[in-house]
């Protein structure tokens, strides 16, 4: 990344352009790290995951059908930065560019007067991942859709993972980072319990969880998770032989999400679950300041 930005600086790119490129690539590397991917082995399928990741990063919104913090225009700019980075890497190290391009017709009004003679060759390159630059609407998930989704999961671990997302509004990485010692003792005389000071975007916050779900987690830990020997205490770990005991990755959770969705024809991403939970709180008449506290918003 340093070499690429240095190359861009040598081409007299504006300082703001260099800052934007650095920010875009930092976001991309955060996704790679969260997913366990290596930058030189990224495939087009992983780029599609990255687009979902970008959309799911809108965390500080409380409104029904609010547009994403990252507009589709911003997402396209980030993809353009990554495409140019891989073009540079392809020249330097012969790394394949995972952002595939195809030929498209230029819109007529994009032709300037001096280019009128070139209309017969009116083609330009465009990423196959380019998203429509209109407001991205959050998809609210119904109880029936979620029950159908959960019914198709075959692992107790996965059912609990997605219940945590749907019933608490937690971010996916917050759930993946939950540790056994953070689980409060089940007290069925209470409706809600609190996971104190969980990891959240480089900081910490409290996570409020239905007591019935805390009981399910506690039973799962005692009956299944504790049977897997690890040198860490993450609740959600891989159960595959080759990766046994390693912290469950964003990639694994994403793959499971998409696999089940293909079977039931119900489409949503991780952040849709968070936004659905938030929207349900707002619709119930809860004070917005309380909703912000529950969702872990700073302001």
Regions found by a protein language model. Give the residues of each.
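N-terminal core-binding DNA-recognition domain of tyrosine recombinases/integrases
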Residues: 2-16, 25-114
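Alpha-helix N-cap/helix-start motif at helix boundaries, enriched for small hydrophobics
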Residues: 21, 161-162, 169, 173-178, ...
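Flexible interdomain linker/hinge and immediately adjacent N-terminus
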Residues: 97-143, 239-244
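Basic, Lys/Arg- and aromatic-enriched nucleic-acid-binding interface segment
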Residues: 133-172
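Active-site/catalytic core of tyrosine-dependent DNA strand-transfer enzymes
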Residues: 211-266
């Amino acid at each position: 990344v340093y070499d690429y930005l240095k190359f861009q600086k040598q081409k007299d790119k504006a300082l703001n352009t260099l800052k934007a490129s650095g920010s875009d690539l930092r976001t991309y590397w955060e996704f790679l790290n969260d997913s366990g991917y290596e930058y030189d082995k990224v495939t087009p399928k992983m780029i599609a995951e990255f687009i979902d990741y970008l959309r799911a990063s809108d965390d500080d919104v409380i409104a029904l059908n609010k547009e994403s913090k990252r507009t589709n225009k911003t997402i396209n700019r980030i993809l353009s930065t990554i495409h140019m980075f891989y073009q540079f890497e392809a020249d330097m190290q012969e790394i394949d560019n995972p952002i595939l391009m195809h030929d498209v017709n230029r819109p007529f009004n994009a032709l300037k007067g001096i280019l009128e003679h070139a209309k017969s060759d009116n083609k330009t390159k465009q990423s196959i991942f380019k998203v429509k630059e209109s407001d991205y609407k959050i998809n609210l998930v119904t109880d029936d859709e979620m029950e159908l989704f959960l019914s198709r999961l075959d692992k107790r671990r996965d059912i609990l993972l997605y219940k945590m997302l749907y019933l608490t509004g937690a971010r996916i990485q917050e759930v993946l980072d939950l540790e056994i010692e953070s689980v409060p003792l089940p007290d069925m005389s209470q409706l809600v319990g609190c996971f104190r000071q969980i990891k959240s975007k480089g900081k910490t916050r409290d996570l409020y969880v239905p007591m019935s779900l805390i009981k399910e987690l506690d039973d799962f830990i005692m009956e299944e998770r504790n049977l897997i020997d690890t040198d860490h205490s993450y609740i959600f770990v891989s159960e595959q032989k080759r990766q046994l005991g390693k912290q469950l990755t964003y990639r694994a959770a994403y793959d499971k999400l998409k696999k089940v969705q293909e079977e039931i024809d119900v489409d949503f991403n991780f952040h849709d679950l968070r936004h659905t939970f938030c929207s349900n709180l707002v619709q119930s008449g809860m004070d917005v300041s309380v909703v912000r506290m529950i969702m872990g918003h700073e302001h």
